[in-house]
A protein has these predicted regions:
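Acidic/His-enriched low-complexity segments
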Residues: 1-202, 327-328, 343-345, 361, ...
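Hydrophobic alpha-helical and helix-loop surface patches within well-folded domains
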Residues: 17, 134, 160-161, 166-416
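Short, solvent-exposed loop/turn and secondary-structure capping segments
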Residues: 46-62, 114-117, 144-147, 178-179, ...
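Non-catalytic accessory/interaction domains
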Residues: 79, 107, 112, 130, ...
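Structural detector for internal amphipathic alpha-helices that build alpha-solenoid repeat scaffolds
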Residues: 473-477, 499-513, 523, 532-547, ...
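Amphipathic alpha-helical scaffolding segments comprising HEAT/armadillo-like alpha-solenoid repeats
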Residues: 481-491, 513-526, 546-561, 580-594, ...
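Extended alpha-helical scaffolding segments
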Residues: 667-743, 747
Length: 764
């Protein structure tokens, strides 16, 4: 360690994960000093850590550095969150810090590099290497520094306001990069306009990594995605872009998390709740309110599931490990709270408040009170009540709602009880909209629930057809409000939101034997504007397949031919195959193999496989080169049931298409297939592949592969040995020749020994 200006060595003390430097004099906060540190990083020597959200914390990762795994491109990438970047460069590794940085990366000329900011120079060296110089001249948090290296192909898209948009992918996905990430520019434009804050950084790049320890990471100007999050072929995106929500989430972080950062992990929700809500905003803009509300409900379900296991404040200072903050409270619950705040103050004030928050905290850190103050400045309201009950308290409302109508007095009375445990959760103050439908009209009322038992009375001239509590479907609460069949049918037909129809669909599912509901479901399956509700209707109707065949079978055929969504069409085809038979349907399944949608092709293939396995085996040969995981699973499943040793090359060929938890499904199907195989060389080769899987850093993949080797290979070949020994013993007693069986036994024993040796090698 030396002082740069004087090049004078200075004393320091290095202990564990920190270095203390004696600067030789006292400096004021206004003075600048320069220090250079020469160091070697050894991340692989660090004690392993991590959490469910980020499974490792050594900061710098060398993936397949020797190239021993032919299915995986060698690469280097980093993961800084929470405080892991100090594993590979000295820094004050704390979210309260802001820093600029530059990095020189020297690599073989064949490699592409990526880091924060801009690539300002590439120097070709005489030894076949090059040195890339990246400069990040805008301040950001240390955990957002990144580096990515590999034989990536850089795909450049149309710039946004002169700022480069680029995607770094493996060669195989170069032609598909714009299909995967192509909405990025539109997202940047949308978020910039919505927030009143133009995208603040120098560029925006996205890179896809193998063996990534999380899902994705919002490194400033250079987001990193795990391959399992977004890799698809262009054709696969016909059935939906699987990474679109994550792409939106990480991009929104560039404002919330990077531009304005949480000052401590206790305030992590400032980063993650907004990124989660960024997904909602994008869905709402791109795909409509139904899509956004459906997406939000899935997030809400995730919170409620974890809330059964624990109850914690959204902002909390008493966590055991900082990674504990990465949970369904910081993300899911936080996103729901942001939505409630939006619905309370209204869109104009909401987005004006976000603009003010970003302006006041740009290139700085913030805590939740800074967010409150921004909203208070814009709205002119004291919002302590809202932030206290949602950010600094546990739990959620549990509401029991009852209504009565007095026709004589023309009075509607609604009684609301807050039944949550008040020793854990607060007594909430809840602004809520109620829509009252009566006499062909809708009357919206806003109420404030403030008491443990609160009664509201409204004058209504006629018996209401429906009282729709929380008409905006924005409240994070468990709600018990009984409704009749007539009310829910009316609600489905008249209330405008996905949540209204989804609530009705839950009732319809429980009362599917009702003839009126059956007729309505037939209509819903065709006409509902949202694909998931149409699919839900099909799933409910499938339980009535036998008694409703004359109506349902032609309806499903119609949906297959006419629905505009490929997933709905695929579900209709799957339901037909599961519930009905007929030559007309067989022709339909074969025709499905010619569709562009892999979802439809896969269902058609599965149908043929279940009805005519020998025909499916013939069809599979022509489909083996299709780059669809849905179809790969279908073909593997068929081979696991009907295949022979001749089908083994297919499993070897497609292995590289799977990563992460997908390898568990691959390994299980592969094991079932190998169980059928009779040739020793096939089984040994398969056991070697499974042994590599069992050496995975992913403990779930590791365990699953070990179990497959033991159950599907060791035990099976032990059974073969036992059977042959029994046959040999019997023939010996009968004084018959056992030469042939002994030869078979020798092969079986040698095969079993090799399997056992491989198994023991991974158990050590």
């Amino acid at each position: 360690v030396e002082e740069i200006i004087t090049e004078k060595s200075i004393t320091y003390k290095y202990e564990n994960d920190s270095i203390k430097i004696d600067l030789g004099k006292e400096y004021t906060s206004k003075e600048t000093y320069y220090v250079t540190i020469e160091y070697i990083s050894k991340p692989n020597e660090l004690k392993a850590g991590g959490s469910n959200a980020i499974t490792d914390d050594k900061g710098l990762y060398f993936i397949n550095p020797t190239g021993a795994d032919e299915d995986k491109m060698p690469q280097i990438w980093t993961q800084g969150e929470t405080q892991s970047n100090s594993a590979w460069f000295p820094t004050i590794d704390n979210p309260t810090e802001k820093m600029t940085n530059e990095i020189y990366i020297t690599v073989d000329e064949k490699y592409t590099t990526l880091s924060n900011g801009l690539l300002v120079n590439t120097q070709k060296n005489t030894d076949g290497t090059k040195t890339d110089h990246w400069v990040m001249d805008l301040p950001h948090a240390p955990y957002l520094v990144m580096m990515g290296i590999g034989e990536f192909k850089k795909v450049t898209d149309e710039p946004w306001n002169g700022k480069e948009i680029s995607y770094y992918v493996e060669k195989e996905y170069e032609q598909h990069a714009k299909a995967i990430f192509g909405k990025t520019k539109k997202m940047i434009e949308f978020y910039s306009n919505k927030l009143g804050t133009p995208y603040p950084w120098q560029k925006y790049a996205q890179i896809v990594a193998r063996d990534y320890v999380s899902g994705a990471m919002e490194n400033t100007t250079a987001t990193l995605h795990g391959d399992f999050v977004c890799y698809q072929t262009t054709r696969e995106t016909i059935d939906g872009a699987k990474g679109e929500g994550t792409i939106a989430h990480e991009l929104f972080h560039q404002w919330f998390g990077d531009y304005a950062s949480c000052e401590s992990w206790s305030n992590l929700t400032l980063n993650e709740s907004f990124a989660t809500y960024g997904e909602y905003l994008w869905e709402e803009f791109e795909n409509g309110r139904d899509a956004a509300d459906n997406h939000s409900a899935e997030s809400r379900f995730g919170y409620f599931a974890q809330a059964q296991q624990k109850q914690v404040d959204l902002v909390r200072f008493d966590y055991n490990e900082r990674e504990d903050m990465f949970d369904a409270f910081s993300y899911n619950k936080g996103g729901q709270i942001i939505h409630m705040l939006r619905k309370y103050v209204g869109d104009d004030a909401f987005f004006a408040s976000l603009k003010l928050y970003l302006e006041k905290n740009k290139f700085k850190t913030a805590e939740v009170h800074d967010l409150r103050l921004a909203f208070e400045e814009v709205t002119g309201q004291d919002l302590n009540w809202f932030f206290n009950e949602w950010y600094f308290a546990k739990g959620h409302p549990e509401l029991e709602i009852k209504k009565t109508y007095d026709g004589t007095l023309k009075k509607l009375t609604i009684t609301i009880n807050q039944n949550q445990d008040l020793t854990v959760a607060p007594l909430y103050k809840l602004p809520v909209f109620i829509d009252i439908y009566a006499d062909g009209k809708k009357d919206r009322k806003q109420i404030w629930i403030e008491d443990a038992k609160h009664t509201f009375t409204f004058t209504v001239d006629k018996q209401p057809d429906l009282v729709n509590f929380d008409a905006e479907r924005q409240l994070l609460a468990k709600i018990d409000f009984a409704k009749t069949k007539q009310e829910l049918v009316f609600q489905y037909k008249n209330a405008p939101l996905w949540g209204d129809r989804d609530e009705a669909m839950s009732f319809f599912s429980e009362h599917a034997n009702d003839s009126d509901i059956q007729s309505l479901l037939m209509e819903i399956a065709v006409t509902d504007p949202w694909k998931n509700i149409r699919s839900q209707a099909i799933a409910i109707l499938a339980t009535l397949a036998k008694e409703k065949e004359s109506e349902l079978k032609p309806l499903l055929v119609r949906i297959y031919h006419e629905d505009k969504n490929t997933r709905v069409r695929a579900l209709a085809l799957k339901t037909l195959a599961l519930k009905y038979k007929g030559d007309d349907l067989n022709a339909l399944y074969e025709q499905a193999l010619n569709e562009q949608s892999y979802a439809i092709v896969s269902e058609g293939f599965d149908a043929i496989a279940s009805l005519n396995p020998s025909l499916a085996m013939k069809k599979a040969t022509a489909l083996e080169n299709e780059a669809s995981k849905d179809l790969m699973y279908s073909i593997m499943d068929l081979y696991a049931k009907q295949g022979t040793d001749d089908n083994h090359p297919y499993f070897i060929k497609i292995k590289k298409q799977f990563s992460g938890f997908e390898l568990m499904s691959y390994g299980n199907l592969y094991g079932k297939f190998l169980k059928r195989c009779t040739k020793s060389e096939t089984v040994i080769d398969g056991a070697k592949v499974l042994t590599k899987l069992a050496s995975s850093d992913n403990k779930y993949v590791k365990y699953a592969a070990q179990k497959v080797i033991k159950d599907n290979l060791m035990n099976v070949w032990q059974g073969k040995e036992d059977k042959l020994n029994g046959q040999i013993d019997k023939l010996k007693k009968e004084n018959q020749d056992v030469t042939t069986l002994n030869a078979e036994l020798k092969v079986v024993q040698e095969t079993k020994k090799q399997i056992v040796d491989l198994y023991n090698s991974i158990k050590k």
